[in-house]
């Protein structure tokens, strides 16, 4: 009942946000013509779809590296299949948790698979993804920091605030990695034996220490994370040109981490409405992109991911021989 109410709330918020955006920018006048322009700019749409596909493949490569760090020897083809399918559950569930749940459950069926290492690999996957996005954003931010004073107050505050957020996140990730080391954990266990002596917690921390044990793999995973976001953000850059707009690449790269973070908030379904408003605000401030064009480009960028999500759904049905009841089971476990 609680999950149903939560979903209804998100659907309601999504509907209201989209209605307000479409009403403000007169959907049939300022937004719809940009969708029609995609017929003439189809190569940009195709390029965007390819970039999304590359980012998904790189996500599978990164996860495979982390799985090896957890001593889970699973074939590259299987990791790629589960990663592609997880995108289907990301767009059909109430959030990323659906895709993450499938990633664990999908590999649990493999011989020798263990639940804790799989769960930790997914958690570390997100952690190193955050690190990669932080490095990319701060690099782009530094590249045009000399222009910050020329921006409007709203955009300036958003960029400054996100810079502090990303900087703080990188520091916290670094502290977390250090806290996973056996020497520091053993010291802490002597100080607080009742809390840190809890065996399941010790097993969890030992699994997380794979970041240090396989430090070469961790560095490779961070570098791949940067590439993942570059290709993901390139798909939105292509979507701008697909709807007939233009925008410098550097500004798009700087804005997209903020857009992704806002869309990831558990407010609306798939970030709809929140993503469009954030994208519109930042693109207009950084590049002068008209509001209607920005909203259309944001929706097209999202639809590119939806298309790959539907491909993941087809792969799920074909390779797993899954029924609707199995899908419902995955969603129930995700909730």
Predicted regions located by residue number:
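Hydrophobic alpha-helical transmembrane segments in multi-pass integral membrane proteins
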Residues: 266-270, 277-302
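Membrane-interface alpha-helices at helix entry/exit sites of multi-pass transporters
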Residues: 77-81, 99-100, 111-126, 289-300
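Predominantly cytoplasmic-facing regulatory/coupling regions of multi-pass membrane proteins
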Residues: 1-84, 143, 148-264, 289, ...
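Transmembrane helix boundary and interhelical junction motifs in multipass membrane proteins
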Residues: 57-62, 95-104, 250, 264-279
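Mid-bilayer segments of alpha-helical transmembrane spans in multi-pass integral membrane proteins
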Residues: 87-97, 114, 126-138
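Hydrophobic alpha-helical transmembrane segments of multi-pass membrane transport proteins
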Residues: 76-105, 109-110, 117, 263, ...
């Amino acid at each position: 009942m609680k999950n149903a109410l939560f979903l209804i709330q998100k659907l309601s918020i999504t509907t209201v946000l989209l209605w307000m955006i479409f009403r403000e920018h007169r959907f049939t006048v300022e937004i719809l013509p940009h969708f029609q322009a995609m017929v003439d700019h189809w190569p940009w749409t195709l390029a965007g779809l390819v970039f999304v596909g590359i980012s998904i493949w790189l996500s599978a490569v990164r996860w495979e590296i982390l799985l090896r760090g957890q001593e889970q020897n699973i074939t590259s083809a299987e990791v790629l299949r589960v990663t592609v399918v997880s995108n289907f559950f990301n767009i059909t569930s109430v959030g990323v948790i659906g895709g993450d749940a499938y990633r664990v459950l999908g590999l649990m069926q493999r011989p020798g698979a263990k639940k804790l290492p799989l769960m930790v690999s997914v958690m570390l996957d997100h952690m190193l993804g955050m690190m990669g996005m932080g490095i990319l954003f701060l690099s782009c931010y530094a590249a045009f920091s000399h222009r910050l004073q020329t921006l409007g107050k709203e955009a300036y505050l958003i960029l400054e605030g996100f810079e502090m957020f990303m900087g703080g996140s990188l520091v916290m990730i670094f502290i977390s990695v250090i806290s996973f080391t056996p020497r520091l954990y053993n010291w802490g266990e002597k100080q607080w034996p009742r809390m840190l002596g809890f065996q399941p917690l010790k097993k969890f921390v030992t699994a997380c220490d794979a970041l240090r044990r396989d430090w070469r793999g961790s560095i490779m995973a961070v570098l791949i994370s940067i590439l993942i976001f570059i290709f993901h953000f390139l798909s939105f850059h292509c979507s701008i040109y697909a709807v007939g707009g233009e925008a410098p690449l550097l500004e798009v790269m700087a804005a997209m981490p903020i857009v992704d973070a806002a869309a990831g908030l558990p407010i609306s379904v798939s970030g709809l409405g929140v993503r469009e408003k954030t994208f519109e605000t930042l693109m207009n401030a950084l590049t002068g992109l008209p509001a209607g064009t920005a909203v259309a480009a944001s929706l097209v960028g999202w639809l590119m991911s939806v298309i790959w999500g539907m491909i993941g759904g087809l792969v799920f049905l074909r390779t797993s021989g899954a029924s609707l009841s199995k899908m419902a089971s995955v969603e129930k476990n995700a909730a």
